[in-house]
Amino acid sequence: MTAIDLNADLGEGCDTDEALLALVSSANIACGWHAGDVNTMRQTVGWALRQGVSIGAHPSFPDRENFGRTEMHLQPDEIYAGVLFQIGGLSAIVRAQGGKLAHVKAHGALYNQASRDRPLAMAIVHAIRDFDPSLVVFGLAGGELVKAARELGLQAKEEVFADRGYNADGSLVKRGTPGALIDSEDAALDQTLTMVREQRVKAIDGTWVPIRAETVCLHGDGAHALAFARRIRERLGSEGIAVRAGA
C-alpha cells in the first residue's frame, strides 16, 4: 500500500490544533520565536503525545512581529545558535512529558531561504546534527536544506504543500503574489494526489515539475484548515493511500 506522512504547523495560536492532531501523522510545533510560548508548547506536545503523533520542532527567525515571514540575513553562527536553542527548548518539554523529539522543520522565511541558500541550510543542519543526529530534517522537495542534511549523514524528508502554488523551478510562489495560495479545496486535493501518486506538480506557468513527495504539509492556520484536513484524509483513504509518520 502507498503511504504518505501528513504534517501540520501547530502551536501558532489557532484553535483547531487539537482537532488537527487527530488527522495528521506529524506535528511541527512553534518554539516561541515566531509564535507560541512555553505554555502553548507544553499543551500542544501533550495533545500530540495523546494522539500518537510524531513531534517536531518548528524553529524560525526571531520575528514575532511578522510571524517569521520576513527575510533576515543573519550570520551562520547566529542561525546555528538560534536553531539549537529552539530545538533544545522544545525537546526538553517533550522529554518531560515522556516523549522524544523526532524531526525538525524550519518555519516561514527561514525555511524558504534555507531551500536556496546553502550556507544557511548548512548552519541549520549542523545545529540539528550536533543536538541529535537521529532527528529527521523536513525541507522543501529538491531544496538545499534536504541536500545539506543528506550530505551530513542525516535523514531527510522532502516536503510538498497541498495548498501552495509552485514555480517552474520547484520553488514555492512567494506569498502575496498571484498563484501563491490555492483557495479551492478541490484543486488542493487534486494537486496533493498528483504529487503523491505521480511525483510531479503543475507549476503556475503550466509546466510539469518532477517532485519527490515524502511528507505533505497541511497549514494549520488557514481559514478552512480543519475541513480540508478531513477531506484529504478521506480522499487518501479512498485512494488506498495510508497516512503514517514513517512513510
From Swiss-Prot:
Q: Which GO terms describe its molecular function?
A: 5-oxoprolinase (ATP-hydrolyzing) activity; ATP binding
CDD domains reported in the protein's UniProt record: LamB_YcsF_YbgL_like
What does the record give as EC number?
3.5.2.9
Asked if Nucleotide-binding is a keyword of the record, the answer is yes
Any coiled-coil regions, as ranges: none
Q: Which InterPro entries match?
A: Glyco_hydro/deAcase_b/a-brl (IPR011330), LamB/YcsF/PxpA-like (IPR005501)
One GO BP on record is: carbohydrate metabolic process
The highest taxon in the source lineage is: Bacteria
This enzyme catalyses: 5-oxo-L-proline + ATP + 2 H2O = L-glutamate + ADP + phosphate + H(+)
User: Which Pfam family is an annotated match for this chain, by its short name?
Assistant: LamB_YcsF
The UniProt keywords, alphabetically, are: ATP-binding, Hydrolase, Nucleotide-binding
Q: What enzyme class is recorded for this protein?
A: hydrolase
Q: Does the keyword ATP-binding apply?
A: yes
Per UniProt, subunit arrangement is: Forms a complex composed of PxpA, PxpB and PxpC.
User: What is the protein's known function?
Assistant: Catalyzes the cleavage of 5-oxoproline to form L-glutamate coupled to the hydrolysis of ATP to ADP and inorganic phosphate.
Record family assignment? Belongs to the LamB/PxpA family.
Q: What name does UniProt use for this protein? A: 5-oxoprolinase subunit A
